[in-house]
């Protein structure tokens, strides 16, 4: 059974765009079909249902729209829907013709629990090609006016918003079909006025290539407006005299297509909308400026419910699931890193780039980037000096892989054994050589940095940092040790993505030797190798056993930084994403650990070396993340303590 959690409290609602079967001009039949669909989806915990344009009459009635009988039938059908909606916890948008002040309007009726919340008329009427809407209808008014329809007094106007009292993030607006195709769709103003969800009631006939264009419009508008966008398309039952309708239903959120039905499939698009995310996106975007002038807000009630998400929640949000997209992403990141490093080496007139090579993942990626930077500059790979600096915890495996990797890439390889230097340093500060504490570990890291810096200084070189984004978030770096460099090429790359980039290079390099060593590096446990090896010479100190699985920390990092979600929401998302892989107690324990370390280790991030931004999440104190080094985590930890596993 899927994990269920309080959806409203965490900004989620379930929404659907459906195309009920209809009969042209048979309002009684159509109302019955709509009521059936409304009840069906209410039982499935759908809280927002969008139906097509003229769902009560059919879009293809043509001159029948001028008949009193059809208009009365549509009003009676709406009255039946209103009555049937009583006691249902769902908001429904239904398309119908409305006569007002002697003119006809193409409207979306917004229905909730027996109440007609409002009528939103179509603004842009197509009168070209196969469309002749101006023959029957006029464009809707912006400022809402009072109207009586289906036995209720309500408002009619395009500038209407519908707000849920129980969830401030749920603010609904509507537009109709051609409105989306217009140069400036009404939804632009709706979103600036506060709408987080736009529902489009449509009757878009199907022609060759149109579904792809329709999909692009919906996704593009949701991205531009930082909103969720529902698109319900007319389908089976419309007249085929001159057109065919495919029922192509879509739901997009901030540019991402969440649900997309195949044309003519007769299916509904159903998913959950993360409205909390929309609010977060807007408050971060300083060019998204509110403008509420001329708008009227109608409030409605929906009881909070719990949901098990049907929308996918990736365990690896930094890593694309599609193989082709992932490969494209890896190549782009490598280019960003290489171009950034090349510019810095060129600007500093560095004679060489110096890297501490451990045989681990991060230094491996940094070396791959450095070689690419040399190609950008037209320089020999020999201008990159890779130094291995073995000490107490270095294994034969990592030492061997470091050398093989350097030979395969054609860089200059060197070794500086720091064991005696570290022992001498221990003697200087009175550190027992058999006391394996944090000083024991940090001394080695700082000596390595000292060697790298002085080697670079002596040879006119430039120290290239290897630490990744995940390590920076957790503070898994020695202050003024591996924390310091002259340019950190991996600073914007999370650990889960580092693995895939190295795998990508292994798959595309064309060298059996290079591929072999890269695969073995990928298979090596992540470790700083600062504690003595095990008796069998293998790695004794494994990072993920100490700070937690990187796939969890990268998951937490993504939602903390990218969207500013609360600890509770992140925990619920983790329960959904890692269901069956990690026990709830484990997820919560590592989430607490993440927040403890993230706050405590900010002082290291406050003085980071320069490094290129590669994605939407980064920790540069000069760029995306500015946080005081002495901030308290009390509120976050208190929220975590209230969670029940």
Q: What are the language-model segments listed below?
A:
Residues 1-354, 372-381, 413:
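Enzyme catalytic cores with a strong preference for nitrogen-chemistry domains
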Residues 13, 22, 30, 168-170, ...:
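ATP/NTP-dependent adenylation/nucleotidyl-transfer catalytic domains that generate, transfer
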């Amino acid at each position: 059974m899927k994990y269920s959690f309080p959806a409203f409290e965490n900004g989620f609602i379930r929404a659907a765009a459906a195309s009920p079967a209809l009969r042209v001009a048979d309002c009684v039949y159509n109302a019955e079909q709509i009521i059936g669909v409304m009840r069906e989806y209410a039982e499935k915990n759908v809280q927002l249902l969008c139906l097509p344009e003229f769902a009560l009459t059919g879009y293809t009635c043509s001159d029948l729209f001028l008949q009193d009988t059809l208009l009365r039938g549509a009003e009676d059908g709406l009255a039946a829907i209103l009555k049937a909606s009583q006691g249902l916890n769902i908001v429904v948008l239904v398309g119908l013709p409305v006569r007002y002040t002697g003119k006809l309007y193409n409207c979306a009726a917004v229905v909730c629990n027996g109440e007609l919340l409002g009528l939103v008329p179509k603004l842009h009427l197509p009168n070209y090609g196969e469309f002749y809407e101006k023959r029957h209808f006029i464009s809707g008014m912006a400022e809402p006016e009072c109207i009586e329809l289906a036995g209720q007094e309500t408002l009619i106007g395009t500038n209407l918003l519908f707000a849920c009292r129980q969830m401030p993030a749920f603010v609904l607006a509507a537009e109709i079909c051609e409105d989306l195709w217009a140069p400036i769709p009404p939804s632009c103003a709706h979103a600036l006025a506060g709408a987080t969800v736009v529902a489009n009631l449509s009757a878009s006939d199907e022609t060759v290539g149109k579904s792809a264009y329709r999909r692009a419009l919906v996704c593009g508008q949701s991205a531009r407006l930082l909103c969720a966008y529902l698109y319900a398309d007319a389908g089976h039952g419309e007249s085929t005299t001159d057109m065919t309708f495919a029922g192509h239903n879509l739901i997009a959120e901030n540019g991402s297509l969440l649900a997309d039905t195949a044309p003519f499939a007769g299916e509904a698009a159903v998913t959950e909308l993360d409205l909390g995310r929309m609010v977060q996106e807007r408050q971060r975007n300083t060019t998204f400026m509110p403008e509420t002038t001329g708008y009227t807000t109608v409030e409605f009630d929906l009881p909070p419910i719990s949901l098990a998400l049907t929308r996918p929640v990736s365990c690896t949000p930094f890593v694309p699931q599609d193989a082709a997209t992932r490969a494209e992403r890896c190549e782009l990141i490598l280019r960003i890193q290489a171009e950034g490093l090349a510019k810095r080496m060129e600007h500093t007139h560095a004679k060489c780039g110096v890297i501490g090579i451990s045989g681990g993942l991060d230094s491996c990626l940094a070396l791959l980037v450095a070689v690419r930077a040399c190609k950008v500059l037209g320089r020999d790979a020999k201008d990159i000096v890779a130094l291995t600096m073995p000490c107490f915890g270095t294994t034969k495996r990592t030492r061997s892989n470091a050398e093989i990797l350097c030979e395969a890439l054609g860089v200059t390889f060197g070794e500086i054994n720091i064991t005696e230097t570290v022992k001498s340093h221990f003697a200087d500060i009175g550190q027992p050589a058999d006391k394996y504490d944090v000083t024991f570990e940090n001394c080695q890291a700082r000596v390595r940095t000292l060697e790298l810096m002085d080697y670079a200084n002596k040879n006119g070189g430039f120290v290239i940092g290897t630490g990744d984004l995940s390590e920076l978030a957790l503070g898994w770096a020695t202050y003024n040790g591996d924390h310091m460099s002259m340019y950190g090429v991996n600073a914007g790359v999370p650990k889960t993505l580092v693995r895939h980039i190295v795998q990508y290079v292994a798959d595309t390099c064309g060298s059996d030797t290079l591929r072999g060593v890269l695969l073995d590096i990928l298979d090596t446990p992540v470790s700083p190798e600062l504690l003595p090896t095990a008796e069998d010479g293998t790695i004794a100190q494994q990072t993920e056993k100490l700070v937690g699985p990187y796939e969890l920390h990268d998951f937490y990092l993504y939602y903390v930084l990218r969207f500013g979600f609360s600890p509770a929401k992140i925990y619920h998302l983790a329960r959904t994403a890692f269901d069956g892989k990690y026990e709830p107690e484990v997820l919560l324990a590592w989430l607490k650990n993440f927040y403890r370390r993230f706050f405590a280790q900010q002082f290291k991030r406050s003085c980071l070396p320069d490094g290129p931004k590669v994605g939407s999440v980064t920790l540069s104190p000069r760029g995306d993340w500015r946080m005081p080094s002495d901030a308290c985590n009390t509120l976050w930890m208190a929220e975590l303590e209230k969670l029940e596993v």
